Amino acid sequence: MKKTTLLGLILGWIAFPALAQNKIEFREFTLDNGLHVIMHQDNTTPIVVTSVLYHVGSKNENPERTGFAHFFEHLMFEGSENIDRGQYMNIIQSRGGTLNAFTSNDITYYYELLPSNELELALYMESERMLHSKVDITGVETQREVVKEEKRQRVDNQPYGSILTETLVRAYSVHPYQWAPIGSLDHLNAATIEEFQQFYKDFYVPNNATLTIAGDIDYAQTENLVIKYFDEIPKRRKEI
């Protein structure tokens, strides 16, 4: 026992400097509207990742309107008041970038990977998503079909495709984890445009989001850009 304890102490002492060296340095601040911002500077490669995490997932949904959080993951690429419909991806990709998003029980997450000289573009695009996204009949009807096809591919036409749904409903009898993020297509079909618009107003707000910027950046310049594009976005007054 003593030898084992001594060996553990020696290994811990050896590993500690390595862990200390791998510590990731970052800076963070919060805007007056509640947006939490985390920045990490790494100038080894001329790229930057910009991401926004919204604290909304399937657990936040009305049990009669499941699938909203995942649906919005798609809808938020429809464009905004200042970005033409369907052009969000084209703009990022035309600048040499990639982008994607995902939804879980707890969060909805969007990101762009771009050359570092396009950081301002990424921040502008995410601010448009947060403040001016198009939530209208055209976008909703378009994305309904996209989500239907996704469900067919990933769930309906897959061996054991329903195993997650069946497991969750048996594991959680009361907790909102009882339904999968894909939700119910019947609920999405029954929802009104006003319900979609209210979901956007409730959850796509700065005080329900964390903005993360990592890569080839300058801290002071990046903070100024964040303030430029996000500081005037109003917070949600109602508690989330």
Residue ranges and their predicted role:
Residues 1-4:
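Positively charged n-region of N-terminal signal peptides that target proteins for export
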Residues 6-10:
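Sec-dependent N-terminal signal peptides
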Residues 15-17:
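N-terminal signal peptide c-region/cleavage motif recognized by signal peptidases
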Residues 22-53:
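Mature N-terminal segment immediately following signal peptide/propeptide cleavage
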Residues 30, 89-240:
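Charge-rich, well-structured scaffold segments of protease-associated domains
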Residues 33-35, 41, 54-58, 96, ...:
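Short, well-ordered turn and helix-capping elements at secondary-structure junctions
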Residues 43-45, 56-60, 82-83, 116-119, ...:
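Solvent-exposed loop/turn segments at secondary-structure junctions
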Residues 49-112, 178-182:
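M16/MPP (pitrilysin/insulinase) zinc-metallopeptidase core fold and M16-derived inactive scaffolds
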